Amino acid sequence: NGERSRADDYRAQGSLLMEYEILKGLSISVSGMLDFTQGNLNQFRPSTLDPQFNENYSKGGMLRKISLLTEELLRYNTSIREKHNIELLLGLSVSKDQEFSMQGSGRRSGSDYVYYYPVQVEGGIHNYGTATSPRYRPLTTYESNFKEKTMVSYFGRIGYNYKRRYLVEFTYRQDGSSTFGENHRWAKFPSIALGWAFSEESFIKKWTERWLSWGKVRASYGTSGQIFDDAYLAHGIVKMEGGSFNGVTLAEPGENIAPELTWEKTKQYDIGLDMDMFDNRVGLKFDYYYKYTDGLLYSVSLPGDIYYNSTQMQNALEVSNEGIEFDVQADIFRESAVKWRTKFNVSRNWNRFEKSANGRDIGNLIQGRPVNAFNVYVDDGYFQNEDEVPRYYNMQGDEKYLSNDRLITISAKTGYSNLVGTPKIMDLNGDGVINNKDRMFYGTSLPMAHGGWANEISWKNFDLNVLFNITLSRQMRNNNAWTLTQGNPVFVDLRGVSFWSKEGDNTTYGRIGTYAESLRSQIEKVNSVSLKQITLGYNLPKQFVKKIRLSEARVFVTGENIFYWSNYSGGNPEVISVYTGVDDGGQYPLPQKWTIGLTLNF
């Protein structure tokens, strides 16, 4: 059809490291890193694809990003009598990120065969109306944007262990970022970690030496910070999008200035256990963590009319996360010709919305409930006739039907509620109105457990790697299926699907033309297993590799997203966001991908 689009991406990375040993155990290092990326885009649409104005259209854009990082480290390591091991570290880090973008467009070029807009048409605007009723539109547009942010960090670490049996480490860092207001740029983040290699204790060895190779318990506490992506959110943003006056473009505030914005801070506690057993054939790892994050950004409504915008970004929310992680690794066959190592991990996370700035719930964020919660209406089939539709009486004694988020309802005297064939939603508080007060908590989109199973098998020059993903008891809402009752559904397999049409029907969905969302009946408890990746490789014989002056050569074939099994009524649940758990039919399915490769080492 003549439409063209071209994208070119470029990237260059470079790093430099210099290290010098001043004294035995004392060294200094200086490093630098540069990361440059640029993307160019050009799009062209010929005049034949513009039925209204018969104009061709060309658009071009460029996005350039530059990241610079320099880091200076002073290290000191020493051991006293091979018992007391000490490690000291002091560091300074400076980073700068720049982003520059520009784009422009042009219309009414001289030819549909020139894909780039050559020169600006004289005048720059065109009247698409008449002399008496003009309607002007620019023939060319241009916009550009520049962002820059800088961060400076000072940090230090002190580590000590006795015979590598008792371990303690203290870390402290102070970070400053240009993204915050002048009085809130700096933040302090201390942390401490403790460890005990209990397997080295003589009183434990005599009970465990036959099966325990190594074991350690560990605990830590630390704080960390997060900056927001927008470089100027705290300083206020001015947009050149306010229209024009007398031919001059106007500027307007994009966001209210927020000089009190500061770091999102997280306090985290960890307890862990590491064990290797049976001559290091089996390894176990267990972790428990608790994280509390405050100062999360949220757009807060402002009182009165004195502000240009009615909202302001503030550090307004607090959220907690708690979880466990378990890993096991085992060498099933280690000394035989066939070697097989298997790894299994499983994790569980709980989160909770702890607090808002004003102490109130925010939409689906209910204090004390999970962040990823489903707050739904309770439904029980469909209204089969008018007698099933609840009736209420107002203050004047008039009989009314059940209302949908309205106090003014259809009079019951007409005998027609327009609710027959629609979901029978429970009025939980009995006020005659279906609204958010009738919602109930019905689980979370976070799975009860999520894990993976990896296998590494080798025989002679062949190797096989297989990875499975497993998800258990994940709540999901199949919103996509309910679009079938609307006039513009996302088309799915209609076999076995039925719609309510008359009294007594026991159908999959209500009558055509109705739609209800956030219903309990839409929630499904989903389990799934997927073969995510399988790789078969072959290492060429060493004699042959040496003849062609290589140190190693390997050919392999890899498959991704091979298959999945799930009890979900929709498509592959892996593409549904774990944060929302809502399937709206807009997710692109995971492609099955096969790769053939060759690895050469010189």
Stretches found by the model and what they are:
Residues N1, Q43-S58, F100-T141, A234-I257, ...:
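Surface-exposed loop/turn segments flanking beta-strands in extracellular/periplasmic regions
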Residues L23-G25, S79-I86, R165, S199-G215, ...:
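Short loop/turn motifs that connect adjacent beta-strands in outer-membrane beta-barrel proteins
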Residues M102-V114, D331-G443, N567:
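Conserved small-residue
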Residues S177, S417-N418, T471-E560:
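Extracytoplasmic gating/loop element in the C-terminal half of outer-membrane beta-barrel translocons
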Residues D8-R11, L17-G110, S178-R185, Y290-G323, ...:
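Small-side-chain secondary-structure face that scaffolds active or pore-lining regions
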Residues A316-N321, N364-E388, D493-R495, G504-D505, ...:
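C-terminal beta-signal and terminal closure region of outer-membrane beta-barrel proteins
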Residues E3, A12, T132-S153, G243-G283, ...:
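Outer-membrane beta-barrel signature, preferentially recognizing the C-terminal barrel domain
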Residues R6, R11, Q52-R165, Y221, ...:
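Outer-membrane beta-barrel transmembrane domain signature of Gram-negative proteins
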